[in-house]
């Protein structure tokens, strides 16, 4: 058994379709993070937010900005470097036509751990919104700079990013910002004016994928933008037909128990209880 049921809001997706002159959106990729047209694909990559924790609980915004720029350039390069499937030329044609990339995040919950912010709280919602706005702003800014150097995506005329008939609108936060978390300000007017002058390299720039496997490889506890799945659990892996069971325990949770003064036996007992009953 694999996968869970989900709900797709088709009308909402088409209202945000960056290339409505090419097609109406009908479906997503298998994981559901990116709506795609016929034969389209999207080159994905995710920034590990857990790496931007500072000792004082703050966020290393400057390093996050630099890495967002680098990742955006990298993903645009991937569009060119992909081998695609030679027997299906439409795959390459569709990819180069809109040059979709999907820069996302993982480890948001990890970053909240270190910042002392509770996931799901009003502070947590604002913190997540500020993080993603920052990433999106600098991904779009970099894509515009790439358009200057390499040219905009070929299907830009008639798209929402058409410099002559720009219909794209800057995002409006549904959450009132109360804190700034020492985050540098972003000016969306700069993005609007720059698109009018230079266009943009990629029809899509950001998307948040589930990152289940790559988060595990990277040592993240929070997949994508999700809260931590569980503080302790057993992961089932298909090992050549047999069920390989891997026991997982949250390093952050274990550290908190250590800091609280619990010995190894007490920690083991708590992990076993959490594994069986949840937390």
Label every model-predicted segment.
Residues 1-279:
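Long, C-terminal-biased catalytic regions of enzyme "large/alpha" subunits
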């Amino acid at each position: 058994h694999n996968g869970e049921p989900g709900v797709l809001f088709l009308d909402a997706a088409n209202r945000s379709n960056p290339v409505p002159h090419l097609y109406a959106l009908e479906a997503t990729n298998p994981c559901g993070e990116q709506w795609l047209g016929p034969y389209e694909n999207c080159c994905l990559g995710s920034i590990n937010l857990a790496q931007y924790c500072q000792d004082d609980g703050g966020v290393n915004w400057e390093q996050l900005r630099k890495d967002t720029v680098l990742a955006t350039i990298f993903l645009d390069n991937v569009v060119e470097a992909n081998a695609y499937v030679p027997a299906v030329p439409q795959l390459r044609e569709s990819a180069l036509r809109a040059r979709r990339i999907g820069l996302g995040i993982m480890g948001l919950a990890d970053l909240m751990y270190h910042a002392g912010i509770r996931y799901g709280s009003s502070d947590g919602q604002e913190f997540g919104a500020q993080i993603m706005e920052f990433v999106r702003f600098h991904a779009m800014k970099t894509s515009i700079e790439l358009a200057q150097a390499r040219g905009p995506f070929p299907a830009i005329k008639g798209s929402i990013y058409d410099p002559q008939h720009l219909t794209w609108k800057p995002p409006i936060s549904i959450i009132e910002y109360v804190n700034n978390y020492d985050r540098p300000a972003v000016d969306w007017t700069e993005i609007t004016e720059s698109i009018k002058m230079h266009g943009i390299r990629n029809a899509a720039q950001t998307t948040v994928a589930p990152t289940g496997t790559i988060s595990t490889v990277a040592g993240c506890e929070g997949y994508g933008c999700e809260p931590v799945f569980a503080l302790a659990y057993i992961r089932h892996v298909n090992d050549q037909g047999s069920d390989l069971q891997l026991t997982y325990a949250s390093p952050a949770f274990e550290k908190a128990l250590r800091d609280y003064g619990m010995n190894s036996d007490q920690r083991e007992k708590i992990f076993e209880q959490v594994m069986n009953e949840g937390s």
